[in-house]
């Protein structure tokens, strides 16, 4: 079940062209990319592209944030000194707090929806893909997370003058991208990265809230938890923005696994530097649940031998 962000859009017509009934069980799952959506969060769009009926937009309006696109106007916009609305799409505004209260922000909201799903599942087995949109641009954090960190907390960028003077032609092209040019400037990094760090801290806090909820529901000791990300962000390292190439900043993402079974006690709390991939996660979960990963359909390898 999906709660949160996905880049995949349901496509009924494609399923029909494949000769599959889009309303069949297989067709529904395929056009939802294998998910049963509990709540889809397909990302924030500028006003011209906004769907006013998104569940999060409806929720914000119910809390008094009146707008055709409350997500954009409140969750990802700040208020200037003269009451003007400052867009989170402009990096210079990352130092301001979002107009939305923290308890109604994207991260808090999706954590609540995840807990709703777990609570509603009762004693039935469940599998949840909780996908947070933050930390991600628009770089706009709600108070108090917008100013928990200062420019002095920002680490020096991992880049060299040689990289800038003599880049590979492909990297040279990416260095000309607007984001790369922006993050090449120290002033931009010192404005954006503290907000980015605040958004990471907010994720930490709400995951802590979710862990306590699982404990209260009696499910901490029978739930495998996998924490990871789809990619990193250069934020100025190697004179780049975004996440397009193969440096560690882009592809070396976190992977933390909580395996509550006694077989994992020997490795609990340890770190492993061997390279694994996202495609290894589905075989890992299948084997942990007692199944046999179908090798003719799955490319990855189970990570249980590293955990047990």
Where in the sequence are the language-model features?
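Histidine-centered active-site microenvironments of extracellular/periplasmic hydrolases
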Residues: 138-144, 148, 212-270, 274-277, ...
